Amino acid sequence: MQGVMSKYQINAPAKINLFLHVVGKSTSGYHVLESVFAFIKLYDTLEIEIGSKNRGVEFVQFSGISKHDNTVQRAIGHLVRRCAPGVAKNVYVKVTKNIPVSAGLAGGSADAAAIIRLLGKNWGISEAGMNGVAASVGSDVPVCLQSRTAFVCGMGENVKLLPHARLPNYVVLVRPNDVYLSTRSVFDAYACKEFSKSIGNPPEASDGLLSLVMQSRNDLTDTAILLVPEVKKILAELQSLGGCILSRMSGSGATCFALFEDGEAASDGVRYLKGRHPEWWVYETEISQ
């Protein structure tokens, strides 16, 4: 018996990778990474009905995601299996997609993390249980469960929050319109003669962290450029903007970003890019500190 239906609306924030190093490969064949994640004020919105007559997941503003095989549906399935008998109820979710898909911004992982947080609390699942579900759904989901600046290593299972991190606040995002670059395609094409050296623990002080970020890189950039040559042009255009502190690709691409200390400089850059490159998606946002 479903009983009273509860309705919720929650936001799922996108992430950017301030750096991403490939430091090895596991015995299971997966690449071992080190990265600093920061979350930004670009959100998918999830409308959730718990105890609904309906069940399932619907996506709005993007039609290319399967209703039956997606990160939200997988997260719900894992949560149901961890519930005490009789606790789980029908769940209906409508996801309004504002985060570009297959773009290196972890939109699908963010959506899964949002539903894990909400249903986990409603259904009495422990923090450890929610973390276990997150790791089962995808490598970016554990850090998205926190949605705060963090150092992530391994295959996404090791998350160290960086509460004292203070980063340039303003962000300009750019990606080629209608280009979808899957994580799998980039890693399948990735080949290196030598892995990056592990950095160990990142500095917690904000000055040290920014210095580390500036000296680091995204090891997947060259591979992404082979698949989407436009990425190289985007990075050069971002770096040329007045006030740009850093330009870099996020995740496996194809979205790139620039960081600014000055909001007016970021806005000027957005106006310039939109006027010069109508073929690009350009978005101005901020880091969630």
Curated annotation (Swiss-Prot):
InterPro entries xrefs: GHMP_kinase_C_dom, GHMP_kinase_C_sf, GHMP_kinase_N_dom, IspE, Ribosomal_Su5_D2-typ_SF, Ribsml_uS5_D2-typ_fold_subgr
UniProt record similarity statement: Belongs to the GHMP kinase family. IspE subfamily.
Protein name: 4-diphosphocytidyl-2-C-methyl-D-erythritol kinase
NCBIfam families: ispE (TIGR00154), PRK14608.1 (NF011202)
Gene Ontology MF terms in the entry: 4-(cytidine 5'-diphospho)-2-C-methyl-D-erythritol kinase activity; ATP binding
Binding site for ATP: P100, V101, S102, A103, G104, L105, A106, G107, G108, S109, A110
GO BP: isopentenyl diphosphate biosynthetic process, methylerythritol 4-phosphate pathway; terpenoid biosynthetic process
Reactions catalysed, as given in the entry: 4-CDP-2-C-methyl-D-erythritol + ATP = 4-CDP-2-C-methyl-D-erythritol 2-phosphate + ADP + H(+)
Active-site residue list: K15, D140
Biological function: Catalyzes the phosphorylation of the position 2 hydroxy group of 4-diphosphocytidyl-2C-methyl-D-erythritol.
EC numbers for this chain: 2.7.1.148
UniProt keyword terms in alphabetical order: ATP-binding, Isoprene biosynthesis, Kinase, Nucleotide-binding, Transferase
Keyword Nucleotide-binding carried by entry: yes
Enzyme class: transferase
Annotated metabolic or biological route of this protein: Isoprenoid biosynthesis; isopentenyl diphosphate biosynthesis via DXP pathway; isopentenyl diphosphate from 1-deoxy-D-xylulose 5-phosphate: step 3/6
Keyword ATP-binding: yes
